[in-house]
């Protein structure tokens, strides 16, 4: 008996829910069609009253759904879902009513949509509703399947229950398949890859499946989505996604790149060690041969013309050897080669400080004694290789020094004398003016030039310490540059005087205000007054704080009788803060007397106050006035 009473109570509640939803829909339609603000507020109150009744019924339904006395809870869940849907609609109405009609957001909402865009949005909306309905049905079927599984007994199989369970599972899979298709249609609609008309053509078939798929005599259309070619779209989407994943898999990993970089570093280090060892061996050989060349300097007094011709022939051979060996030496480290050649030339300068540089290096290029004819090719070969290494490094570092090497010419007997100390001092001056990397290159250039040029040394008894050598053009240029730099340093300005002059010049640096011309006050109606009266207006009249303290009549006076001044600008800004708006057609300030009766995208109409500045200088009221937004002075300020 109690179960029957409970069932009657549930049916009464369902009837109340149906009636309440019908009343809610009726009030909602009236609210959507209304244009009056006051009427909308009244209808919103009616909606709120009705939704509260539905919420109480929803709480009762939730209580019954949670109890175990009722076996079939499908109707309870359905009515609860309907009430919750109406609650969501009421929330949307509340958000819309909170937006003011004359605000920016309100005007943007009221903007008209394109008909095609509106049709697309409507199509997306009903597809979304269909997906939600299928999701709800799938949840109910899953709940039924779970309850059916709970009735199975251990060790016993009921074939009828099993067949019913398999039927439920197939229906769930079919629902999910349709959900995927509908979601794909929505995605293609949003991307404008399919027209809304093509989707609306199959709307009836889709809604037939959504509403009648649970009936016994339902016949499903297997070719429902064939007209939309969704299989090709899904295949292209899957191919694009797989392409992105494959491209990401082909990218090298950080660990692989780091391992390859470490292997490259180890390989470079090994090559550098091999180059250093090779350069060291070349350096040792060059030092030994330079000592042998110094010992043979004593035999240079017995030279004749025949030996000079022989020296020319050997010089040509040394140059050819230099060219042949240059390709092999170029692979060595330039820095190591520089140090090696520097070490070759320095012992000669130290052992014989009074001997010219050309004397110490002449035998390197052309030994002239008959006893040294067998060892000369070896000496020239080794010195040529060292000189080629220096030339390769020098050509990489500085083209100017390569040009200096080419400027060296054979000396003549009538050339002026230049001892080694003078040459060393000039190279030192070159080192001071050059960069640190290039400081060792001049010495290297001298050794190379001495190895590739012909030198004829004929010392006499009177020339014990100084030997005539050629003065190349590049040395003359260096001497001139050195003298010029010394003269410039002598006439340099003292740092203290320079700082003092700079500070004095900064005192008169022009300011940003110097760019604008000063605007002096010129009275409109000048009248002679005593000097103790103010000759200019107070700065207070040009401040926005003053406009906040005066009444609107004063603001109107400042606006109309101070044209083109800053006072007119601040008066207009203050009037806008007080909800006054300027009409450009009538050149009059208007203010809303009440809420407008009608608001559109182009105008609004209602009762307004305006200031009569041409007549009686008073505020007047004008009813049923249409304010066109075209003549509004500032749309942003008006909608703020």
Curated annotation (Swiss-Prot):
Modified residues (Phosphothreonine): 369, 433
Gene Ontology cellular component terms for the protein in this record: CCR4-NOT complex; CCR4-NOT core complex; cytosol; nucleus; P-body
Spans traversing the lipid bilayer: none
Record keywords: Activator, Coiled coil, Cytoplasm, Nucleus, Phosphoprotein, Repressor, Transcription, Transcription regulation
UniProt xrefs under Gene3D superfamilies: CCR4-NOT complex subunit 2/3/5, C-terminal domain
PTM annotation (Phosphoserine): residues: 248-249, 251, 253, 366, 385, 435, 449, 471
Ranges in coiled-coil conformation: 37-162, 287-331
A Pfam family matched in the record: Not3
Acidic residues bias (residue ranges): 301-310
Gene Ontology biological process terms from the UniProt entry: nuclear-transcribed mRNA poly(A) tail shortening; regulation of DNA-templated transcription
Modified residues (Phosphotyrosine): 474
Signal peptide, first to last residue: none
Chain spans, region Disordered: 235-374, 432-471
Low complexity composition-biased segments: 245-262
Stretches with biased composition (Polar residues): 319-374, 436-458
Localization in the cell: Cytoplasm; Nucleus
Tagged with keyword rRNA-binding: no
Basic and acidic residues composition bias: residue spans: 266-277, 285-298
Family: Belongs to the CNOT2/3/5 family.
Function: Acts as a component of the CCR4-NOT core complex, which in the nucleus seems to be a general transcription factor, and in the cytoplasm the major mRNA deadenylase involved in mRNA turnover. The NOT protein subcomplex negatively regulates the basal and activated transcription of many genes. Preferentially affects TC-type TATA element-dependent transcription. Could directly or indirectly inhibit component(s) of the general transcription machinery.
Protein's name in the database: General negative regulator of transcription subunit 3
Encoding gene (name): not3
């Amino acid at each position: 008996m109690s179960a029957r009473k409970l069932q009657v109570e549930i049916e009464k509640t369902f009837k109340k829910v149906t009636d309440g939803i019908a009343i809610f829909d009726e009030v909602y339609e009236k609210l959507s069609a209304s244009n009056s603000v006051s009427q909308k507020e009244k209808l919103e109150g009616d909606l709120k009253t009705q939704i509260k009744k539905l919420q109480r019924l929803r709480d009762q339904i939730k209580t019954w759904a949670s109890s175990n006395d009722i076996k079939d809870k499908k109707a309870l869940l359905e009515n609860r879902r309907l009430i919750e849907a109406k609650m969501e609609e009421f929330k949307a109405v509340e958000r819309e009513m909170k937006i003011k009609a004359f605000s920016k957001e309100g005007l943007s909402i009221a903007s008209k949509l394109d008909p095609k865009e509106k049709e697309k949005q409507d199509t997306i909306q009903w597809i979304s509703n269909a997906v939600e309905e299928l999701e709800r049905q799938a949840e109910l079927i899953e709940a039924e399947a779970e309850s059916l599984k709970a009735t199975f007994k251990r060790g016993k199989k009921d074939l009828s229950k099993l067949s019913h369970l398999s039927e439920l599972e197939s229906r769930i899979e079919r629902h999910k398949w349709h959900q995927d298709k509908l979601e794909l249609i929505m995605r293609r609609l949003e991307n404008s890859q399919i027209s809304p008309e093509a989707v609306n053509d199959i709307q009836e078939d889709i809604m037939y499946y959504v509403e009648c798929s649970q009936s016994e005599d339902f016949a499903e259309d297997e070719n429902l989505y064939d007209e939309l070619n969704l299989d090709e779209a899904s295949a292209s989407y899957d191919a694009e996604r797989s392409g992105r994943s494959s491209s990401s898999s082909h990218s090298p990993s950080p660990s692989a790149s780091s391992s390859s970089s470490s292997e490259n570093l180890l390989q470079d280090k090994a090559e550098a060690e091999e180059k250093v060892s090779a350069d060291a061996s070349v350096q040792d050989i060059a030092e030994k041969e330079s000592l042998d060349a110094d010992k043979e300097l004593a035999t240079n007094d017995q030279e004749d013309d025949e030996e000079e011709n022989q020296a020319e022939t050997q010089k040509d051979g040394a140059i050819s050897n230099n060219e042949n060996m240059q390709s092999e030496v170029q692979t060595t480290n330039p820095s190591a080669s520089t140090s090696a050649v520097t070490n070759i030339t320095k012992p000669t300068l130290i052992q014989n400080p009074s001997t010219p540089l050309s004397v110490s290096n002449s035998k390197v290029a052309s030994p002239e004694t008959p006893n040294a004819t067998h060892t000369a090719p070896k000496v020239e070969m080794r010195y040529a290789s060292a000189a080629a290494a220096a030339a390769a490094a020098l050509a990489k570092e500085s083209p100017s020094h390569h040009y200096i090497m080419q400027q060296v010419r054979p000396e003549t007997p009538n050339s002026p004398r230049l001892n080694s100390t003078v040459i060393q001092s000039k190279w030192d001056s070159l080192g001071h003016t050059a960069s640190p990397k290039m400081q060792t290159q001049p010495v290297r250039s001298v050794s190379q030039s001495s190895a590739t040029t012909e030198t004829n040394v004929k010392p006499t008894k009177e020339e014990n310490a100084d030997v005539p050598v050629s003065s190349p053009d590049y040395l003359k240029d260096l001497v001139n540059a050195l003298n010029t730099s010394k003269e410039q340093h002598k006439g340099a300005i003292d740092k203290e005087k320079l700082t003092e002059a700079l500070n004095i010049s900064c005192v008169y640096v022009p300011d940003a205000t110097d760019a604008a011309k000063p605007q002096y006050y010129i009275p409109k109606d000048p009248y002679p007054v005593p000097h103790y009266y103010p000759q200019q207006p107070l700065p207070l009249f040009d401040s926005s704080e003053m406009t906040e303290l005066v009444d609107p009549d004063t603001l109107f006076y400042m606006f109309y009788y101070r044209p083109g001044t800053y006072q007119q600008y601040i008066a207009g800004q203050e009037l806008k803060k007080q909800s006054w708006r300027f009409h450009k057609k009538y050149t009059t300030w208007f203010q809303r007397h009440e809420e407008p009766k009608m608001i559109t995208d182009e105008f609004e109409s209602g009762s307004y106050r305006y200031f009569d500045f041409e007549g009686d200088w008073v505020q007047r009221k004008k009813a049923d006035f249409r304010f066109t937004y075209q003549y509004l002075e500032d749309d942003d300020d008006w909608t703020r």
